[in-house]
Amino acid sequence: MEKSYSESYAAAGVDITAGYRSVELMKQYVARTMNEHCIGGLGGFGGLFELDCTGYKHPVLISGTDGVGTKLKIAMIMDKHDTIGIDCVAMCVNDVICAGSKPLVFLDYIACGRNIPEKIAEIVKGVAEGCVQADCSLVGGETAEHPGMMPEEEYDLAGFTVGVVDKEKILSNETMAAGDVILALPSTGVHSNGFSLVRKIFDIDANPDVLHTAPAELGGKTLGEALLAPTKIYVKPVLKVLEEVDVKGISHITGGGFYENIPRSLKKGCCARINKADVRTPALFQLMQKTGNISEHDMFNTFNMGVGMVLTVPAEQADKALDILHANGEPEAYRLGVIAEGEGVELC
């Protein structure tokens, strides 16, 4: 079928032809995420996915949506767009696995000042890679050109995921008790939260060239490279643990750091007792704290501090959980703390 073209619409700033070109360029990446449950291809009004309920007594769907925040500004300055999509997927799927669910499908939304097909394809390349890592299918998306609302070179990125979990296996903290062990799954860096403060610490908006410097603390990486490290996707190792261990709670450490996110999975009357000396904090966070003269409390209340996800498990199953994590892509997972009587997070 011949593609349509509108000179009037193009004159208003919306290039339909660029949209077609973007879709053609991204098809090869989207194809990597498809499986036998996907029905149809790109171009429909909705993404179709056949739900296989085999093995589920009472399947429950869980949805999540998120974006990448102002980490996008770092990607734009560095002109590197092929990993920011991984961040978008990670922010969504890491949230829904906190209920014990397996992500099934993902959709993305890109708003841009001008549709530059090669750039859009690079963004979607990252989204597709994130979907592969999370073992879910990229079944649809939208690229919206916003002339007059956004500068031509800028874009925003958001995503949406749906997962499934058996109702009887939805994670519950009802049996959480003092003595349970908190396990840490290391992050790859700042992940996708706190970048407004990061930009202020390094004065990035006024001095973007700082991203091309290589502070000694970063072991040869530039600041921009360290900050753009993609958010880790924890789906596969966590699902493996859930198969064999009585996990009592999972927290994805995002905006708000330890103090906001760990309590979200705690039972009332329980607190997370963590020795600060046991937190394996990467050099990047130490550089940020020193450069910005940020208090320790604010660091733990804003950033993940090197811990991207925590699992709470019975003490007698902690070693087994660590063995599973170590064998499934999380070789550096470690004991972070214990559950005690109280409320919230106790960093001592």
Predicted ranges, named:
Residues 28-188:
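Glycine-rich phosphate/pyrophosphate-binding loop regions near the starts of catalytic domains
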Residues 22, 26, 48, 92-93, ...:
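Buried hydrophobic packing segments
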Residues 2-37:
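N-terminal amphipathic/basic leader segments beginning at the initiator methionine
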Residues 156, 169-222:
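Short, acidic (Asp/Glu-rich) active-site segment that either coordinates a divalent metal cofactor
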Residues 15, 66, 179, 252, ...:
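Residue-level signature of catalytic and energy-coupling elements of molecular machines
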Residues 23, 121-124, 195:
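Hydrophobic face of alpha-helices
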Residues 54, 67-68, 162-166, 188-190, ...:
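Short, glycine-/Ser/Thr-/acidic-enriched flexible segments
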